[in-house]
Swiss-Prot record:
It is found in: Cytoplasm. Its main location: cytoplasm. It comes from Pectobacterium atrosepticum (strain SCRI 1043 / ATCC BAA-672). This is Uroporphyrinogen decarboxylase. Substrate binds at R27, Q28, A29, G30, R31, D77, Y154, T209, H327. The keyword Signal does not apply. Its EC number is 4.1.1.37. Pathway: Porphyrin-containing compound metabolism; protoporphyrin-IX biosynthesis; coproporphyrinogen-III from 5-aminolevulinate: step 4/4.
Length: 354
């Protein structure tokens, strides 16, 4: 495999010295870019885009052609695992992801298979290999998965949810059923992420988008426990380098200490966390990723720069910070504003690494 020309993202995740703070954006390959919309139209629909390795590679690389980003992230979806389990993922216009066969009973969970990542999810591994080859060592490639809890919310609710009443009914009325589902999902995520690492992903991230919907006790039992199991079972070295693992729970700022105990290398922060406070609490154990409000990219360039400066000052001198948004970039953000953001992070962060 080609040597990395820019490894500052990997170094920052391991709290090693860097010259400037690395930056990438969640959903950096996406609908805010006109070239993405053109490629998606060529593919026909979202899942066809995910399943075509050449087109998935193209959209992964598109933001790197525009911006001096320090990492690429695999273009895929968190719901590939439930789809591979046979739930029948589809996308309803204006409603987001849905499943033809949601989980409604203990029997449904018992019969769920654990997918083979090189078979049912082989298209994802083909995309990883294709992207890695085309990156030619410019920047590292991030692989990812949804967390067991977050995947379970979609599988039990049948799609997106605001109140999570269906899965919480299962959690409180049939906890054994939910634990069986989460255990199967954790096993599936372990196989899936390890296959991505073998295929060429140089870092991995677990997205726990809906962990913040839980109470502290329930979060530890139904979400964090299973992410801990995943971290314990991941291949942490490949091609002679450590493969860093980042955990991100949206709305999880109150649980950073518990998250840091999992043995992960970094924690993602959403914009509701104060990065200075987070560093005081867990900065001796993990790197931190984040955490500008994605809506700040609607502001004028001077305001975006001001916010970047504020977050850099909050983290302070030294290593262990990967700059990012606190969640995915919005689809109607002007692409030039994303450019202002990336350039400002690099220019303003140099003083913090002197």
């Amino acid at each position: 495999m080609t040597d990395l020309k820019n490894d500052r993202y990997l170094r920052a995740l391991l709290r090693q010295p860097v010259d400037i703070t690395p930056v990438w954006m969640m959903r950096q390959a996406g609908r805010y870019l006109p070239e993405y919309k053109a490629t998606r139209a060529q593919a026909g629909d979202f899942m066809s885009l995910c399943k075509n390795a050449e087109l998935a590679c193209e959209v992964t690389l598109q933001p790197l052609r525009r911006y001096a980003l320090d990492a690429a992230i695999l273009f895929s979806d968190i719901l590939t695992i439930p789809d591979a389990m046979g739930l029948g993922l589809y996308f309803e216009a204006g409603e987001g992801p849905r499943f033809h066969s949601p989980i409604t009973s203990h029997a449904d969970v018992v019969k769920l298979p654990v997918p083979d990542p090189e078979q049912e999810l082989g298209y994802v591994m083909n995309a990883v290999r294709t992207i890695r080859k085309n990156l030619a060592g410019e920047v590292p490639l991030i692989g990812f998965s949804g967390s067991p809890w977050t995947l379970a919310t979609y599988m039990v609710e049948g799609g997106s949810s605001k109140a999570f009443t269906v899965i919480k009914k299962m959690m409180f009325a049939e906890p054994k059923t939910l634990h069986l589902l989460l255990d199967k999902l954790a096993d599936s995520v372990i196989l899936y992420l390890n296959a991505q690492i073998r295929a060429g992903a140089q870092a991995v991230m677990v997205f726990d988008t809906w962990g913040g919907a839980l109470s502290g006790r329930d979060y530890k039992e139904f979400s964090l426990h299973y992410m801990h199991k995943i971290v314990d079972s991941l291949q942490r070295e490949n091609e002679g380098r450590r493969v860093p693992v980042t955990l991100f729970t949206k709305g999880g700022g109150q649980w950073l200490e518990a998250m840091a105990e999992t043995g992960c290398d970094a924690l993602g922060l959403d914009w509701t966390s104060d990065i200075a406070d987070a560093r005081r609490r867990v900065g001796d154990k993990v790197a931190l990723q984040g955490n500008m409000d994605p809506s700040m990219l609607y502001a004028d360039p001077a305001r975006i720069e001001q916010e970047v400066a504020s977050i850099l000052a909050g983290f302070g001198q030294g290593n262990g910070h990967v700059f990012n948004l606190g969640h995915g970039i919005h689809q109607d953000v002007p692409p030039e504003h994303a450019g202002v953001f990336v350039e400002a992070v690099h220019r303003l962060s140099r003083a913090y690494h002197a």
